[in-house]
Amino acid sequence: MQIVEVKAGDTLYALARRYATTVEALAFDNQIADPARLTPGQSLVIPGGREGVRRCAEVNAYAYPNIAPEVLQEALPFLTALCPFSWRFDAQGTLIPLADERLVEAAYAADTAPMLTLTNIGENGGFSTELGHVLLTDGTVQDAVLEGVVERIRERDYYGLNLNFEYLQPFDRVAYSAFVKRAAERLHPLGCPVSTAIAPKESAEQEGFLYAAHDYAAHGTYADRVILMTYEWGYTFGAPQAISPVNRIRRVLDYAVTVIPRRKILLGISNYAYDWTLPWKQGSAARVLSDAAAVELAVSRGAEIRFDETAAAPWFNYVDAEGRAHVVWFEDARSVLARLRLVEEYRLAGISVWTINQRNRTLWKVIEGAFNAEKLL
């Protein structure tokens, strides 16, 4: 696998001849909508060869139940574990089921381990600080939730449990760590591992609802795998910037490896793009699109794709039909490879993709070129 950057005047036909492949293969692997059109700065994955020495690594991924069957089937061969998103619970501790039977069945057919993913998402669809507090401080509710988890794992044959609790009260930090410990003690005798997903902290003292309740050292002690959610620096309601900048990821990893065993860490990988209208105004929302759609947009608008070397992330500007300026930050083969190299550099267990609902053949080609995905089944 090679990665090349399109230069002015390049055509897919010329690139195919140069690298001894076909236009059809390049168009398919890179999800190129119109093979006759490229744009400068666009990165392409070229079939053949390997990026360095391929090591074994774990590849976890989240998916919503509405993922297209064909998109799921393309991803599963490259996955170690799949986390359908997500099971919830109410204030009495009753689990609210997720219609993920199709995903669990497909995962097992591909030797991919399906995980029951439990969150503190409330009725309104967002993470609920209050619901999380109830679970962490009410023993009766906690008992009911854990027993419900065990029943559902047995009923649907999940491989293990993934905990993704966000926006908890800072004063619930100790209680959340204790819950992770208790969940592991309940599930380990059943042969079920427990993983957690935690915010990208750069120090133990980092404050804020997103960070304070996540105790890196405790999760590293009690959980079998710890997913670092190293994305969303650029987010829907924030100012335009790279979604998953490598320079910020390094700060997180520099801290994380001092308190979490490296063999337990999965590095978060984003699989989406944001399109901001300029000038950006506080409270305005970016539009979410797939990485492939971002490239198509650049091509259709004749925009040159640039690459921020500090963040290791691609971006471009364009003007829409109404004359409004935009900036788009996304991920491409170069940015994905930069993050996979961090896994090797920091000797981590692997990666975790959020999410695989958007088709991204380039992502899988780059992962395939760097890793042999471990299979637990």
Language-model segments: which ranges?
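Primarily a LysM-type cell-wall glycan-binding module
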Residues: 1-21, 42-44
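Acidic/aromatic/glycine-rich contiguous surface patches that form carbohydrate-binding/processing clefts
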Residues: 339-377
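Conserved, mostly hydrophobic/aromatic
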Residues: 82, 163, 226, 267, ...
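Active-site groove signature of glycoside hydrolases
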Residues: 83-86, 146-175, 225-239
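Glycan-binding loop/region signatures in secreted carbohydrate-active enzymes
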Residues: 120-132, 271-339, 369-377
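Short, acidic/polar
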Residues: 63-77, 139-154, 208-217, 331-342
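Substrate-binding surface in catalytic domains of secreted glycosidases
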Residues: 91-98, 174-298
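Glycan-recognition patch characteristic of GH18 chitinases/ENGases
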Residues: 49-148
